[in-house]
């Protein structure tokens, strides 16, 4: 049969044959019916909750499977991809031969052939000049729902002229029994082919593989065109001033970029081109563990009809226990971005960023709550992507655990990290943007820097007060730290002042500096990385 938008002949070109029916770009109402059919079993089945949202389970895969990620190594990718088996840096870009790719593609197309399929055409990227037109093909209704939530939904006029740049075939029900002979990690796979412009998924039901798969591809394609591709949140003020927030989990990225005085551009993935900053996505993928209306009202109220909950515990009466992490701590909800009130409309993009904020939660008690970065320090700290967590031990002693993630998103980088740093700084320098390192972590008192002080710091950055402040240079890290800021406790700005004995800060600072240097060594395999060593801490 032929359905508006795509024909069985087009699917046959991908290797999918004898399709019984094509459900093309289904409406939310149709998806609701499909997901709640009483005949569905296993992970295909959706459960209606009292919030109005559907809840689904993804089985043993409650997060991404980075060890099962592969990219075909060929003439296009050989000298461009940041490969896992080359250079000093560790990453997830494991090479795959064309022969094994063909085998995996055969498994997925065989799984999808003869089935009733959902085909969803979407955009990745809010800027029409640089967006990817992505076609998702799946046999599972809620997976179609997920991508409808997460990607940008084309208008009917745009669908009429839609020509896919990239195909994602999700064969979650199939696995690869020959994985051992082929030298792969397991029977599951998430594989990419830049020449064929295609992603294959097998064995894992986790929705985030589709979202982050396309992020990895944007991270390949855009920087090669001189466009920054960023794992960050972004917002815009009343004077059209744009700020972007980088930070790993637990640093306050979502909380601090959600500001009643500013409109949200997006919460996770953005590009920065000649026109300005733009969202890659048309939705949000928020963590829900321990979610409460008081702490996260925007997310809480976004969980309603058309939202899709993943791996939450649903009680017999349909209520959701957000505090129950028995399935996973990584419980999630996806929803279209318009479920949030204070957003940029109608297109999730704005002008050039003037403020770039790197968030870190330093559990070592060394870094100041805020500092201004030079251009080289901007690249150094962007490549370092540092945060740290406090981990309790059996005797109640707490030892900080450092985390370094290149560009605050190493898992999704397809090119060498220095390429992202270079493009970001070029974009910043072209418009005179300034970067700041903001520490939302701990200091010498053993207490975390208060959210009140951190919000006042962010306000001082956004309204320009910080640029008028006198600064001093913090030794070892060579950071320019303001001496006073409106609304900020002056006793915390110099981290040394939070210690009864300043020698204690010195000792911890030297230890952390060594960790920075050890981590940064992996970027010195390129001239660009080697040139930045001097912008790091001095041991």
From Swiss-Prot:
Q: Where in the cell is it found?
A: Cytoplasm
Give the main location. Answer: cytoplasm
EC number(s) recorded for this UniProt protein: 4.1.1.49
What is written in the cofactor note of this entry? Answer: Binds 1 Mn(2+) ion per subunit.
Which reaction(s) are listed as its catalytic activity? oxaloacetate + ATP = phosphoenolpyruvate + ADP + CO2
* Residues given in the record as substrate binding sites: 64, 206, 212, 332
**Listed CDD domains:** PEPCK_ATP
List the molecular function annotations (GO) for this entry: ATP binding; metal ion binding; phosphoenolpyruvate carboxykinase (ATP) activity
Cellular-component GO terms for this entry: cytosol
Q: Tell me which domain of life the UniProt entry assigns to the organism this sequence originates from.
A: Bacteria
Q: Respond yes or no to whether keyword ATP-binding is given for this record.
A: yes
Sorted alphabetically, the Gene Ontology BP terms of this entry are: gluconeogenesis
Keyword list, A-Z? ATP-binding, Cytoplasm, Decarboxylase, Gluconeogenesis, Lyase, Manganese, Metal-binding, Nucleotide-binding
The yes or no answer to whether the keyword Manganese is present is yes
The entry's Mn(2+)-binding residues are 212, 231, 268
Q: Which cofactor does it need?
A: Mn(2+)
Pathway in which this enzyme or protein is active: Carbohydrate biosynthesis; gluconeogenesis
Which parts of the sequence bind ATP? Answer: 212, 231, 247-255, 296, 332, 448-449, 454
Pfam families from the xrefs?
PEPCK_ATP
Family label: Belongs to the phosphoenolpyruvate carboxykinase (ATP) family.
Q: Which HAMAP family match?
A: PEPCK_ATP
What's its job?
Answer: Involved in the gluconeogenesis. Catalyzes the conversion of oxaloacetate (OAA) to phosphoenolpyruvate (PEP) through direct phosphoryl transfer between the nucleoside triphosphate and OAA.
Instruction: From the Swiss-Prot or TrEMBL record, give the protein name.
Output: Phosphoenolpyruvate carboxykinase (ATP)
* Organism whose genome encodes this protein: Yersinia pestis bv. Antiqua (strain Angola)
């Amino acid at each position: 049969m032929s359905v508006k938008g795509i024909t069985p002949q087009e699917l046959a070109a991908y290797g999918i044959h004898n399709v019984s029916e094509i459900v093309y770009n289904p409406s939310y109402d149709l998806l609701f019916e499909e997901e709640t059919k009483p005949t569905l079993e296993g992970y295909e089945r959706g459960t209606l909750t009292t919030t109005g949202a559907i809840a689904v389970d993804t089985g043993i895969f409650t997060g991404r499977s980075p060890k099962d990620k592969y990219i075909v190594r060929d003439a296009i990718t050989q000298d461009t991809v940041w490969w896992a088996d080359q250079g000093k840096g560790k990453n997830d870009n494991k090479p795959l031969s064309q022969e094994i790719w063909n085998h995996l593609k055969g498994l997925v197309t065989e799984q999808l052939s003869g089935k009733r399929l959902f085909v969803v055409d979407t955009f990745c990227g809010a800027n029409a000049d640089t967006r990817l037109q992505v076609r998702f093909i799946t046999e599972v209704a809620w997976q179609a729902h997920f991508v409808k939530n997460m990607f940008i939904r084309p208008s009917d006029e745009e669908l009429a002229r839609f020509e896919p740049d990239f195909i994602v075939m999700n064969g979650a029900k199939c696995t690869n029994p020959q994985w051992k002979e082929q030298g792969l990690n397991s029977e599951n796979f998430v594989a990419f082919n830049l020449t064929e412009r295609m992603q294959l998924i097998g064995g894992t039901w986790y929705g985030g593989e589709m979202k982050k798969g396309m992020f990895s591809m944007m991270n390949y394609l855009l920087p090669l065109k001189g466009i920054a591709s960023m794992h960050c949140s972004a917002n815009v003020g009343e004077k059209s001033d744009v700020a972007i927030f980088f930070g790993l989990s637990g640093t306050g990225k979502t909380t601090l970029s959600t500001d009643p005085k500013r409109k949200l551009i997006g919460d996770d993935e953005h590009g920065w081109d000649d026109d300005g900053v733009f969202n890659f996505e048309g939705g949000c993928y928020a963590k829900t563990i321990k979610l409460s209306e008081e702490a996260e009202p925007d997310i809480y109220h976004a969980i309603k009809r058309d939202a899709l909950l993943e791996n939450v515990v649903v009680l017999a009466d349909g209520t959701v226990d957000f505090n129950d992490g028995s399935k996973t701590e990584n419980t999630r909800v996806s929803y279209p971005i318009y479920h949030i009130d204070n957003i940029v409309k109608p297109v999730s993009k704005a002008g050039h960023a003037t403020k770039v904020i790197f968030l870190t939660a330093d559990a070592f008690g060394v870094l100041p709550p805020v500092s201004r970065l030079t251009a080289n320090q901007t690249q150094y700290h962007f490549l370092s992507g540092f945060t740290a967590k406090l981990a309790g031990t059996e005797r109640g002693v707490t030892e900080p655990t450092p985390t370094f993630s290149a560009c605050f998103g190493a898992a999704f980088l397809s090119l060498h990290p220095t390429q992202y740093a270079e493009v970001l700084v070029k974009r910043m320098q072209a418009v005179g943007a300034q970067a700041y390192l903001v520490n939302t972590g701990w200091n010498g008192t053993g207490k975390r820097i208060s959210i009140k002080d951190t919000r006042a710091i962010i306000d001082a950055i956004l309204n320009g007060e910080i640029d008028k402040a006198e600064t001093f240079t913090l030794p070892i890290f060579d950071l320019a730290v303001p001496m006073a800021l409106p609304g900020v406790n002056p006793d915390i700005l110099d981290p040394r002042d939070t210690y009864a004995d300043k020698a204690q800060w010195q000792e911890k600072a030297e230890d952390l500096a060594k960790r920075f240097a050890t981590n940064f060594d992996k970027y010195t395999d390129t001239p660009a990385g080697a040139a930045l060593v001097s912008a790091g801490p001095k041991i």
